[in-house]
Amino acid sequence: MSAPCSDAEQALIGAAFAAGTALNEPFSSGSNPYAGQYTLSGPAKVRDPRVTPIRGDLADIALAGKLFAPHYVVPMERAVTVPFAVLMDSGRSDAGQTSELLRGERFMVLDIAGQHAWGYCAHDCYNGYLALDALGDSAEIPAPALAAADPVAVAQGLLGMAYLWGGRGGAGIDCSGLVQTAFARAGHKLARDSDQQAASAGRVLGDDEAPARGDLVFFNGHVGILLDVETLIHASQGAGGIGGAVVIEPVADVVARKEGGITLRRRVL
């Protein structure tokens, strides 16, 4: 079973939990053999709800003693069995897409209701709902292979892919999804959203440090990857959010369009 985010990852992206023992069954305080070990120890830290697996009725067992919930659940690891599965913000028919999992990626299930499973993505701890029929036994589905040494080359291979909010390369891709996917295939684990990446990916570059291929360049609500010192590859929303795609264009052109210009540069490689 894949472990949830480590303590180091919590510090970087605001994830709310550390690795826990997998028993694959839910339990409340009445049946929890560890119940006496869990006590709240003061005001809880501010936690990013995107990566904190808690609802009004239950939470991941690793949050016991950190956040209160009526029930704590040990997650079950499942794997995506279809080409891609949409992660949604609820189990309703009008739910919005927040991310996407690709074939073989792991999803930690905390609850099943109707046709949906609620839990979090094993690779980045992102919470949400997945269609239950997109998941299968992780023991029978191999995890995606790391097949690239250069994340920039991976991003170039996605040129022309349509922009899709919440996409990671299945039905489409968004700016932070492009960054996360490109670096993941080269063995670098990054957070899901651009603000999380701005807080955690690699190290911040100083104003006196020269740009280099593979650097991440951040704007207000946007991120791209330097192809070279003057050129950016990124998933652009297009004009008014229409016709967006993964494109290569001069950094200066992106700066001219984005209010506030470049807000941050980080280096992972």
Model-derived segments and their meaning:
Residues 113-114, 228:
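Residue-level recognition of beta-strand termini and adjacent short loop/turns
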Residues 163-211:
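Catalytic cysteine-centered active-site loop
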Residues 2-76, 92, 99, 103-108, ...:
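Boundary regions of SH3-family modules and the immediately adjacent low-complexity/disordered segments
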Residues 80, 109, 218-219:
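A generic structural signal for residues embedded in beta-strands
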Residues 4-7, 141-148, 152, 168, ...:
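Aromatic- and glycine-rich peptidoglycan recognition patches
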Residues 95, 101, 205, 210-211, ...:
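Short, well-ordered loop/turn sites that connect or cap secondary structure elements
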Residues 82-92, 132, 137, 194-205:
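Short, structured beta-strand/loop micro-motifs enriched in basic residues and often containing a Trp
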Residues 216, 221-231:
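Catalytic nucleophile-His microenvironment captured as a short glycine-rich beta-strand/loop
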